[in-house]
Amino acid sequence: YYITNVMEDYTPDMDQMLFYLPLAGSTFKKVYFDEVMGQAVSKFVPAEQLIVPYDTSDLDTCPNVTHIIRMGLNDLRKQQLAGVYRDINVIPVQGDVTEVQGEINRISGMEPSQIDYDCTLLECHVDLDLKGFEEVDDEGEPTGVKLPYVVTISQDNGQILSIRRNYK
């Protein structure tokens, strides 16, 4: 019920992902709770927007996964006001089109606009042992075990926008 009636973008997004699959060979879905919309959303993530170590065989045991997120400044501002990201000034930098993205644009008949108002965020899913937030044993001593976090960094200025636990 939820996917077909509440998540209105699910079907068009899934269609886009399935259309893209033969072109790229791999595609991904990201399901998360959107604070601004107040509901769970499911988004298509192209393979070229996901960075993993070369020898990764699956995402569950991967030590780090980075999702490259292109976001409009207005959407970023909404997320900042909702408390998802730190309220800092992010000035977008006009990015170069990669060779892969250029070929995808050519195949799909798209032309990039001359003005790019988007900012680029790097959402890193990593295991960290942060001082003051360590895992502790029964005696209260740090164990040295790294805990899962999601760290979001602005690629445009290199500043950290958020660090939050990624509970498993």
Q: Where would I find each of the regions flagged by the language model?
A:
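Extended alpha-helical, oligomerization-prone segments that build pores/tubes and scaffolds
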Residues: Y1-K168
